[in-house]
UniProtKB/Swiss-Prot annotation:
Source organism per UniProt: Haemophilus influenzae (strain 86-028NP)
Any GO BP: carbohydrate metabolic process
NCBIfam families: heptose_epim, PRK11150.1
Residues annotated for NADP(+) binding in this entry: 10-11, 31-32, 38, 53, 75-79, 92, 143, 169, 177
Residues holding substrate: 168, 179, 186, 200-203, 208, 271
Cofactor mode of binding and number, as noted: Binds 1 NADP(+) per subunit.
Broad enzyme group: isomerase
Subunit comment: Homopentamer.
One Gene Ontology term of the molecular function aspect: NADP binding
Keyword NADP attached: yes
Keywords per UniProt: Carbohydrate metabolism, Isomerase, NADP
Cross-referenced PANTHER family: ADP-L-GLYCERO-D-MANNO-HEPTOSE-6-EPIMERASE, NUCLEOSIDE-DIPHOSPHATE-SUGAR EPIMERASE
Record protein name field: ADP-L-glycero-D-manno-heptose-6-epimerase
Active site: 139 (proton acceptor), 177 (proton acceptor)
Length: 308
């Protein structure tokens, strides 16, 4: 069996899809379906069982057995960079992850987890080293602290433990994320409503490493298949502009004039204007597949979003 936490969420459901594509259906999805709309991410996927996240962690803490587990992909977390309830974030993202990590270490179960580029903060260098890490929000801090925890236990680990610092992920199955969904998702919705696509004023100076979710899932699967341990950036290695995203959306629809709107006050000083993954460490594992450009990935995503 394979366990995917956050399996009804954005990246988790794409990992389930990638596992299905390998012929694996013996998958336990762990999630919180209080937001019932997330069920839609699982409708076309094959899984063996579902468990609520609180029931699951209670079983983990109790030491319950789930049979033979080939791997755990831990994608479940509060991923809202705008959430400022630190007690909730640390419990949900940090303590939960530690419990699951130790369960896997004790049983030598390969453990792959979602970290984030939010661990870096305001830097021009995105390399997996302490000197470049300085999160700007409590979400980023929760991910940073778990990475630090993993770094300390890695030398003693007898089974793979692998964290991925996701950059700006976009693509299918993010519909439930609301305001935290990708720019491409929001621009598509604006055009469908007959509006012009809108970018924040000043965004011509913002550049992000936008990575397609299919590529993210592929790296997770490859690292599992190859027994990789460590903490790795997962982006494309190239920063592209928000304008490039908008251009790809407009080109797909064949209509729309890009407009600018004021930059929100509450995001100032808490917003990464530039991200670009240094992929040196990931490439050193032997992973050599190319990543989709914004033009390629957004076009594929638009086709998925607008399928009949």
């Amino acid at each position: 069996m394979i366990i995917v936490t956050g399996g009804a969420g954005f990246i988790g459901s794409n990992i389930v899809k990638a596992l299905n594509d390998l012929g694996r259906k013996d998958i336990l999805v762990v999630d919180n379906l209080k937001d019932g709309t997330k069920f839609a991410n699982l409708v076309d996927l094959d899984i063996a069982d579902y468990c609520d996240k609180e029931d699951f962690i209670a079983s983990i803490i109790a030491g319950d057995e789930f049979g033979d587990i080939d791997a755990v992909f831990h994608e479940g977390a509060c991923s809202a960079t705008t959430e400022w309830d630190g007690k909730y974030i640390m419990h949900n993202n940090y303590e939960y992850s530690k419990e699951l990590l130790h369960y896997c270490l004790d049983r030598e179960i390969p453990f792959f987890y979602a970290s984030s580029a939010a661990t870096y903060g305001d830097t021009k260098v995105f390399r997996e080293e302490r000197e470049f890490e300085g999160p700007l929000n409590v979400y980023g801090y929760s991910k940073f602290l778990f990475d630090q925890y993993v770094r300390n236990i890695l030398p003693e680990a007898k089974s793979p433990v692998c964290g991925f610092r996701y950059f700006n992920v976009y693509g299918p199955r993010e519909n439930h994320k609301g305001s935290m969904a990708s720019v491409a998702f929001h621009l598509n919705n604006q055009i469908l409503k007959g509006e012009n696509p809108k970018l924040f004023a000043g965004s011509e100076g913002f550049r992000r490493d936008f990575v397609y979710v299919g590529d993210v899932a592929a790296v997770n699967i490859w690292c599992w298949q190859n027994g990789i341990s460590g903490i790795y950036n997962l982006g494309t290695g190239n920063a592209e502009s928000f304008r490039a995203v908008a251009d790809a959306v407009v080109k797909f629809h064949g209509k729309g004039e890009i407009e600018t709107i004021p930059f929100p006050e509450h995001l100032k000083s808490r917003y990464q204007e530039y991200t670009q993954a240094d992929l040196t460490k990931l490439r050193s594992t032997g992973y050599d597949k190319p990543f989709k450009t914004v033009a390629e990935g957004v076009t594929e995503y638009m086709a998925w979003l607008n399928r009949k």
